[in-house]
Structures are given as C-alpha cells and as structure tokens.
Swiss-Prot record:
Transmembrane stretches, start-end: none
GO biological process: ribosomal small subunit biogenesis; rRNA processing
Stored Pfam families: PRC_RimM, RimM
SUPFAM superfamilies in the cross-refs: PRC-barrel domain, Translation proteins
Keyword match rRNA processing: yes
Domain notes for this protein: The PRC barrel domain binds ribosomal protein uS19.
The protein's name in its UniProt record: Ribosome maturation factor RimM
Residue ranges of coiled coil: none
Residue ranges constituting the PRC barrel domain according to the UniProt record: 97-170
Family: Belongs to the RimM family.
Organism of provenance: Dechloromonas aromatica (strain RCB)
One GO MF term: ribosome binding
Amino acid sequence: MTGNDIVVLGRLADPYGIQGWLWLYPFGDDPLAWAEMPVWWIAREGEPWRECRLKSLKAHGNGVVVLLDGVADRTAAESMKGVLVGAPREALPTTEKNEFYWTDLIGLDVINTADERIGKVVGLIETGANSVLRVMGDDKVERLLPFVSAVVLAVEKEAGQIRVEWGSDW
C-alpha cells in the first residue's frame, strides 16, 4: 500500500507500564472508534507502511493507550515511540461538509483575504483546544495558525488552498 492510500490518524507516544502498552496521540476526535479496525498500518515518517494487529485499545485518564501485536514489553514499546498510525482511505468514513482528514490539508496553499500567499500547510498540531496549522512561508519561516472559524474562512481542496483571515506579517 502506498503512502497516498493511507490516511495518518495519529502517532504512538510514550510507553505505558511494562507490558508493551503505548500512549496514542490521535489526530482526530474519536480514537476509541479505532478499536473497530483490527489491523492498523504503521510506519516511521518516510518509511513504507506495514500492517500491525491491534490487540487492545482503551481510554485511560485523559488519553488512550494501545497494545499492538509484537510489542510485548516496555523495551519494545520504547522502540515504537513516534511511529505513525494510519488506515487505508477506503476503510474510513467519508467526511461531512467542513470536516477534513489532516492529510488532506497538508500541501494546500494558505491565502489570506488580501490574496497574499502565507505559505503551504506542512503539518498540524493538536493543542487540546483546537488544531493548529503549521504553515511554511516562502521565506522558510513557519507560522502557526489556529484552525478555528475566525481564522480559517474556507478550505477549497479542489483549488488546493485554504482561505484565512491572517496578516502576511504575522
């Protein structure tokens, strides 16, 4: 499966306990639903995707922890830190109007209301309160724009751009 067929859903974080559990850093709003996917796709950034079986997923405190097949102890879990978790696009529900998978936003040009190009979306950050667009300008300066309706006016995937209320000098 190619990287274009996979939608990145989250990232594995720190180990939890000594039996191979890992904290999951989801890029979406319903990671408990991922338990319905018995096979996940995992990869480090820039590496090929491979299948991995989910053994267990549960809410814990304010987060989610997962146990993956082949990750038997804390040492194995430590080696998984930073690994991306994804799923084939066809296995995911279609998005509603004004809903987006993060992967669909990466690469879009960001244009402000004065028709000035701010840059290109290179990633997103989840802060808890809202998502934040990581926008790399032509000047190689990264700008962080909150993904909220007061800033993001329109996402025009077909046109390859996001319209924002944001000054070019920020």
